[in-house]
Amino acid sequence: MSHPMAGTAGTPGTPRVLRAMNDRTALDLLLEHGPLSRTRIGKLTGLSKPTASQLLARLEAAGLVLATGTTEGRPGPNAQLYEVNPSVAHAAGLDVTPQRIRAAVADITGRTVGHHELPTPGRRTAVPVVQQVTDALDGAVKAAGLSRSDVHRLVIGTPGAFDPNTGRLRYASHLPGWHSPTLLDELAAALPMPFEYENDVNLVALAEQRLGAARDHSDFVLLWNQEGLGAALVLGGRLHRGWTGGAGEVGFLPVPGTPLVRQVTKANSGGFQELAGSQAVPRLARELGIGNIPQGPYTEAAAALLERAAAAPDEGSHRRLLQTYATRLATGLASLVSVLDPELVVLSGTGLTSGGEVLRTLVQSELEELAAPRPRLVVGDVREHPVLRGALESALATTRDEVFDTSR
């Protein structure tokens, strides 16, 4: 497996730059494999034993690696093991929804060390958004036994997207308090660390690309269905955000089978959302005569119905629910794959993953009937707080590039 090098200063090919490249390769190997001996690092990098020893001594002196334990159970003397120093830097992520802000802090190895969830006040609140952000972050930082100043970088995930041309949040009218034109400046003044913002579904795609079903794939679409219906587009290995950040806002897409929704951003909905969003599942179940529909939030009701339907016999109302829902999903997805022709489509969010392989198979079959491209469909692997996991992965990637750069 290849290991990307950090950006380095200086002239390419100089000993300083080559040492920095070797350092980064070794650090990436330690992140991937866990504790390694000098001999093992030498074999994985192709470096001689003396060079590997110098490298580890250099990284240990810089505080980037720690000596930890020894190998046991092998012939010969026990070998010293080395690992990345987990406390060398920390990164944080936030997942913002209308209901709550979820925050987490991870050490540089990716291990989550602090977590906090803050209920988000309703539209009529005296608590400014900046205070909501700092309160959520402080809760996670405190749980990790750290302070704000210990966090190297923060990534904030929200519905919609901040338009890079105006600095204002778009496509998320249901997120109260986040639409001020000065919000980003206010956050920058309140936070001691650099921060970035990203669309929540884009962060799920990043999590799947780094940790889950889209590893080793550079062209894929992630379809998300939970509180809202959206997509993330990864083209040539990079997220495609569009001119205003709105690429992938497919919930607004007009589709057959539902009335046209006009002024979609004011309505905060569109044809595909109305046809196949999670809120449509309980309604469809009632139309099919399915009883015992769960009460409570529609996301939870939809997930429970889909899980029940996937476990039901192949015939009957539950199977008709899955078949009809699969057709609706494929109707909108066909437009996406016809334009983008991706290698892979990842299904994520409880409005999709709860149907498991049964729903995936039905959507795959329907899509093959409706679109010329035939990408492979898979169910996403990152199920636990995927937006937050993506935010942490994004923050960690930049943090590692900065902290692991030994050329400076």
Per-range role (PLM):
Residues 217-276:
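Glycine-rich phosphate-binding loop of actin/hexokinase-like ATP-binding domains
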Residues 112-219, 358-369:
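Glycine-rich phosphate-binding loop and adjoining helix at the ATP-binding site
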Residues 91-95, 151-155, 220-224, 230-232:
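Short glycine-aspartate micro-motif
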Residues 98, 203, 227:
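Short, glycine/acidic-enriched loop or turn micro-motifs at the edges of active sites
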Residues 161-164, 202-205, 230, 240, ...:
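Short, active-site-adjacent cap segments at secondary-structure transitions
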Residues 1-70, 74-121, 125-147, 258-408:
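ATP-binding/phosphotransfer module of carbohydrate and carboxylate kinases, centering on a glycine-rich
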Residues 107, 164, 234:
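Short, acidic, Ser/Thr-enriched surface-loop or helix-capping motifs
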Residues 74-75, 83-86, 147-148, 212-217, ...:
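Solvent-exposed alpha-helices and their adjacent loops that cap or buttress functional pockets
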